[in-house]
């Protein structure tokens, strides 16, 4: 059985092409467990999670990447945020009926993919591509060609393992400033495309790589764990409350007696009463309950 929730980087020594392989199960379950999403929405979040994990592994600096789908369809928002430590969180917003067999375009409607790269130090970069491809992988490949002009292929699979949702994916990318022939890259992509969902989700990573590339010279690096981690906190909620007009905050307090701030990512609730609000206004952080 594979070790899920790990990302593996590898390098083709003879082609100056790098690769990544990731499988997720527990991380995906934690993202889904606080929501009653229809199955097609779960599938999209699984694909987004895999894609974000693969993309964050391409970062050469500390920071995070957000991959977001937006549109006018019944799923008008789906987003996964992850950082270079492979800590992930995500959420979707559903505002209409979802057909059981809805594909990506049916879910999102007229929309686009937004990729936001936020370094720990330096300026944020945002790229936007129209939802023109039939799959998320195709849209992201288009993004790479437009933004980084690096030949890139993504292969994403979703399914179940032992009755629990799981997903996996692989990325191939030509190394920057290398003279890899397109035919060589296409050859590796053709090999990778043969991966079956069952193989990717149930076999150890080294066996998957051997099955695909046993005739190539491949260096495999130590894996990196992938995990769910939400960055919400009582302090961040307090900071958000500072940005609201006092009249609005006082109105909620008068009506409800307290303010309940809910994190869509993890389901946590943070409650603030009148005394807490007074402390916030005095620039004092409210004590954790």
Swiss-Prot record:
This protein's encoding gene: hslO
Q: Which family does it belong to?
A: Belongs to the HSP33 family.
Cited InterPro entries: Heat_shock_Hsp33 (IPR000397), Heat_shock_Hsp33_C (IPR016154), Heat_shock_Hsp33_N (IPR016153), Hsp33_helix_hairpin_bin_dom_sf (IPR023212)
What post-translational modification information does the record give?
Answer: Under oxidizing conditions two disulfide bonds are formed involving the reactive cysteines. Under reducing conditions zinc is bound to the reactive cysteines and the protein is inactive.
Gene Ontology cellular component terms for the protein in this record: cytoplasm
A Pfam family that the UniProt record links to this protein: HSP33
Which cysteines does the record link by disulfide bonds?
A: 230-232, 263-266
Biological process (GO) annotations held by this record are: protein refolding
Give the highest taxon in the source lineage. Answer: Bacteria
Q: What does this protein do?
A: Redox regulated molecular chaperone. Protects both thermally unfolding and oxidatively damaged proteins from irreversible aggregation. Plays an important role in the bacterial defense system toward oxidative stress.
The GO terms describing molecular function are: protein folding chaperone; unfolded protein binding
Q: What is this protein called?
A: 33 kDa chaperonin
User: Where does the UniProt annotation locate this protein?
Assistant: Cytoplasm
Q: Does the keyword Zinc apply?
A: yes
What PANTHER family does the record point to?
33 KDA CHAPERONIN
